[in-house]
Amino acid sequence: DQTDLDGGLSDSVPMMRAFAKGCDRVVVILSKPRSFVKQPEGFRHIYRHALRKYPQTIAALDNRHLMYRQNIADVKKQESAGKALVFAPSKELKMSTYARDEKLEQELYDLGISDFDARLNELHTFLS
């Protein structure tokens, strides 16, 4: 019996793994604006109970905000060194993980396309 969980629990932005695997440059796509600061997970009492057979998962959830913050610090460092090109939403749209608002989803999609189009030449230069 095997249980699989999202890898984002332990490495939300696996950029350093890409470097360790031999990449010399990476394109990082963030789903939150650069100003986003991840907070500790809510509902600890619920996930501690639900995941009691998986103490390492509980620890990963408990520390996820700290790992994310370190990931973002690493991203900024690599971006400054010219080794990472970072795409992030240019503005914040208030959308929760479990939102089912088609209009808001379309706005977020359109923002991503617009942000990408605005930096397409920069991406070509970075990759060449």
Where are these regions (language model features)?
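Patatin-like phospholipase
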Residues: 1-128
